[in-house]
Design a protein with these regions (language model features):
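Short, glycine-/small-residue-rich phosphate/pyrophosphate-handling segment
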Residues: 104-134
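Short coil/turn segments at beta-strand junctions that form active-site/ligand-binding loops
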Residues: 1-3, 60-61, 85-86
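Short, acidic/small-residue loops that bind anionic groups at enzyme active sites
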Residues: 83-101, 114-115
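Short Gly/Thr/Asp-enriched flexible loops that form oxyanion-binding sites at enzyme active sites
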Residues: 73-84, 103
Length: 170
């Protein structure tokens, strides 16, 4: 079986995200979702997550894909993953992240590889049509200071000092 995925969002977005991904890829196995609706709290969400986990094969790990960092779905999932190996919470869930993560699971990647892929495709999936892509910041070479003449100074020559700092701490 593949790595388990649980989608958690505010409102009914989690169910719709899963339906959208399944519309593109077909039905997915070892996946569940929880919605956080008014009147619920973190304890309710933890109960929902734990109930969903009982129906999933978690032997290879679980990735919680949630909407926002610090939101209730994130906080509840964070409390579940704290003492478990191969459990992770990723925020910013979107359709490209889901689609790529589901497709990659078919290739049986390692847990860390799937987490990295979800993060990368989630970021790359957010774009603007007309905005120019930011160019990678290239370090600008510092202009070289003008070179002083290499010839020794004669007694008639004078040194020009532009700035001087006197430090009386010594």
């Amino acid at each position: 079986m593949s790595i388990a995925i649980i989608i958690g969002t505010h409102g009914a977005a989690a169910e719709q995200l899963l339906k959208t991904a399944e519309m593109l890829l077909g039905e997915q196995s070892n996946v569940a979702y929880i919605d956080f609706v008014p009147g619920e709290n973190a304890e309710t969400l933890i109960e929902k997550y734990n109930e969903r986990l009982t129906h999933l094969d978690t032997s290879k790990g679980v990735i919680f894909l949630v909407d926002t960092w610090g939101g209730s779905p994130f906080n509840a999932a964070s409390r579940i993953v704290t003492d478990k190996e191969h459990y992770e919470v990723i925020t910013g869930v979107n359709v490209p992240m889901l689609v790529e993560t589901f497709m990659a699971r078919d290739d049986d990647p390692s847990f860390d590889e799937l987490v990295a892929l979800a993060l990368e495709t989630g970021r790359e999936g957010v774009r603007a049509l007309r905005a120019k892509e930011p160019e990678a910041a290239k370090p600008q070479p510092k202009p070289a200071a003008p070179k002083a003449p290499q010839a020794p100074m004669s007694p008639e020559d004078h040194m020009k000092i532009g700035l001087a700092r006197i430090d009386d701490r010594l």
